[in-house]
Amino acid sequence: MTNPSTINILISNDDGIFALGVRTLANTLAQAGYQVTVVCPDRERSATGHGLTLHRPIRADIVEDFFDPKITAWSCSGTPSDCVKLALSSLIENRPDFIVSGINHGSNLGTDVLYSGTVSAAMEGIIEGIPSIAMSLASFSSRQFQPGADFACGLIQQLYDHPLPDSTLLNVNIPPVTADAIAGVMLTRQGLRRYIENFEKRFDPRGKSYYWLAGELVTEIEQPDHIHLPSHIPTDVQAIQHNYITLTPLQYNLTDVASFEYLQTNQWLERSRDIK
């Protein structure tokens, strides 16, 4: 087994620097011997996707007395993706062996990953060629972060000794149960979740209207047969309901290979050239 003290880890999140999830993760990894640096938003930045700060300055400040003394921690005024970019370019001296984003307070399952600042911070690492993991606790009410943090220790060792293919992000969701109630670990495909969007119209004290987004989760929708993996492989949404830790490999290349091949073999391109 590789000595953890030789492995450098950069941790970020979208819940903010003072979130319990990132504190539990960072302290657990540091106490296991890993070299840990934390760079997180200075406040909650959930559902910011892969947004970047382009029109105002980004500020970063050292955070003391919140994490294990062995950890160097920074708060950043930008988005989760800003945090990773700034860390790699300006804040840390040594290129990390891994980037871990989380542990998010709430799941990142199915199409949630498209909106997730947690996943985007990890994806920024993949874009930079660094093995990266996004970790989420699949509940907004539970505070059972320790099982996920403990799992991260072993997962990083495994990925260090047996790396994933390049450009592969591992999206991990942890069921909100005690360690002894976790059913196991399951490799899953990304599910498809949709929400009934409800923009509630409200009025401020000056009588000016504004809108507040609220959403109600719709039961998971099955994906079309041509999308990537056969339906007998469980989705992350299905597996988490049975208390499995889900491992879903993701990538930043969004090319739809099946549709590309369909367009190649059905004279679609030739016909499109005749469109006026």
UniProtKB/Swiss-Prot annotation:
This enzyme catalyses:
a ribonucleoside 5'-phosphate + H2O = a ribonucleoside + phosphate
Q: Which annotated residues bind a divalent metal cation?
A: D14, D15, S46, N104
Q: What Gene Ontology terms describe where this protein resides (cellular component)?
A: cytoplasm
Where does the UniProt annotation locate this protein? Answer: Cytoplasm
Q: What is its main location?
A: cytoplasm
Q: What detail does the entry give on cofactor binding? A: Binds 1 divalent metal cation per subunit.
Pfam families registered for this protein in UniProt: SurE (PF01975)
User: Do you know which InterPro entries this protein is assigned to?
Assistant: SurE (IPR030048), SurE-like_Pase/nucleotidase (IPR002828), SurE-like_sf (IPR036523)
GO molecular function term, any single one? metal ion binding
Record's keyword terms, sorted? Cytoplasm, Hydrolase, Metal-binding, Nucleotide-binding
Q: Which metal ions or organic cofactors does this protein require, according to UniProt?
A: a divalent metal cation
- Stated EC number for the protein is 3.1.3.5
**First-level EC class:** hydrolase
The job of this chain, per UniProt, is described as: Nucleotidase that shows phosphatase activity on nucleoside 5'-monophosphates.
State the family named in the UniProt similarity comment for this chain.
Belongs to the SurE nucleotidase family.
| Name of the protein this chain belongs to | 5'-nucleotidase SurE
| Organism this protein belongs to | Crocosphaera subtropica (strain ATCC 51142 / BH68)
Q: Give the lineage.
A: Bacteria, Bacillati, Cyanobacteriota, Cyanophyceae, Oscillatoriophycideae
Name of the encoding gene: surE
